[in-house]
């Protein structure tokens, strides 16, 4: 999506605000994946794993991907939503659905 994590610890606060993810309430957790859409879509044909919610349409990436993990801070209250920004390289799990099987 053209967004890449910088050394800026405000990355999560900025991105979640810009993408209107904090309208009406603070979002507890969000993960931004910094890989091409094609690479993320490809996960739907990789390793099938159990979903946390019991569904059976989750897939894990074969290789680690660059992510930014955003978690609401304990003192954060709407409308002043604040998040902790953590960068990592991890295998991602996506739920895939539809005819073309998209994440």
Swiss-Prot record:
Cellular localisation: Secreted
A Pfam entry, by short name: RnaseA
GO CC terms of this entry: extracellular region
Transmembrane regions: none
Record keyword Transmembrane helix present: no
Top-level EC class as recorded in UniProt: lyase
UniProt-listed InterPro entries: RNaseA, RNaseA-like_dom_sf, RNaseA_AS, RNaseA_domain
Gene3D superfamilies according to UniProt: Ribonuclease A-like domain
Disulfide topology: 12-70, 26-81, 44-96, 51-58
Keyword Secreted found: yes
Binding site for substrate: 27-31, 52, 71
Listed EC numbers: 4.6.1.18
Single GO molecular function: nucleic acid binding
Function according to Swiss-Prot or TrEMBL: This enzyme hydrolyzes both single- and double-stranded RNA.
Family: Belongs to the pancreatic ribonuclease family.
Name this protein carries in UniProt: Seminal ribonuclease
Phylogenetic classification of the source organism: Eukaryota, Metazoa, Chordata, Craniata, Vertebrata
Gene encoding the protein: SRN
């Amino acid at each position: 999506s053209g967004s890449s994590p910088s050394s800026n610890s405000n990355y999560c606060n900025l991105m979640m605000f810009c993408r209107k993810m904090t309208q009406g309430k603070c979002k507890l957790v969000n993960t931004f994946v910094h890989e091409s859409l094609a690479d993320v879509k490809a996960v739907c044909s990789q390793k099938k794993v159990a979903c946390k919610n019991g569904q059976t349409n989750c897939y894990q990436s074969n290789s680690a991907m660059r992510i930014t993990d955003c978690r609401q801070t304990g003192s954060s209250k709407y409308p002043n939503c604040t998040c902790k920004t953590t960068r990592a390289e991890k295998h991602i799990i996506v739920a895939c659905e539809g005819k073309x099987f998209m994440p």
